[in-house]
């Protein structure tokens, strides 16, 4: 399989991951899919600590925290993996909750978000989902909450524009939503 450039990835990647694998010509079900997914996660575990935070990420979550706004992190990543990443970057004190999926296939994000919102002591609060994929927009729609999309993540600005949700290009632009 040829190397996938970041620009190509941001145009092609999608949820569910099974569909993305299929588009790449990889197995999307059965034991072959499980093996490829497990292999990816094994490689990811070797290198994840090399992944830096996005520019302004720490400053933004710190500033939002200083405003007294509760922040939760919702991810399609397996929850224990996401919590490890958050702890590694010393961000755990900024989040009321870290919610991920129960599997390595990035499946079940809407269900996990729904469960969190229905059982959280914050369930009657106003929410803003900040994401970087079309699926994040879909999650926000399913939950009936506002969505703001970041153009330097998994999906390109061109792809995100299909949603009609507002788009930011740098994470520090998120602060404008809280400081207005």
Show which residues each predicted segment covers.
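N-terminal helical cap/lid subdomain that shapes the substrate entry/recognition surface
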Residues: 1-58, 65
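A short, structured active-site edge motif that brings together acidic residues
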Residues: 8-10, 92-107
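Conserved donor sugar-nucleotide recognition element shared by glycan-biosynthetic enzymes
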Residues: 17, 53, 106-109, 167
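Conserved H-loop
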Residues: 27, 92-96, 123, 168
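Short amphipathic alpha-helix with an adjacent loop that forms part of the alpha/beta core around
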Residues: 174-180
């Amino acid at each position: 399989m040829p190397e996938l450039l970041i620009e190509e990835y941001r145009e092609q990647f999608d949820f569910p991951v099974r569909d993305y694998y299929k588009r790449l010509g990889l197995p999307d079900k059965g034991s072959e899919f499980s093996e490829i997914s497990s292999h990816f996660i094994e490689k990811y575990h070797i290198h994840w600590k090399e992944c830096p935070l996005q520019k302004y990420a720490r400053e933004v979550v710190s500033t939002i925290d200083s405003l007294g706004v509760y922040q939760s992190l919702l991810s399609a990543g397996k929850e224990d993996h996401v919590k490890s990443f958050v702890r590694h970057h010393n961000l755990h004190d900024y989040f009321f909750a870290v919610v991920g999926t129960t599997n390595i296939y990035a499946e079940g994000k809407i269900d996990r978000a729904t469960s969190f919102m229905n059982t959280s002591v914050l369930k009657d609060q106003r929410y803003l989902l900040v994401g970087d994929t079309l699926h994040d927009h879909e999650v926000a729609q399913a939950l009936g909450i506002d969505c703001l999309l970041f153009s330097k993540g998994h999906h390109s600005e061109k792809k995100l524009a299909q949603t009609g949700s507002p788009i930011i290009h740098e994470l520090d632009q998120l602060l404008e939503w809280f400081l207005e």
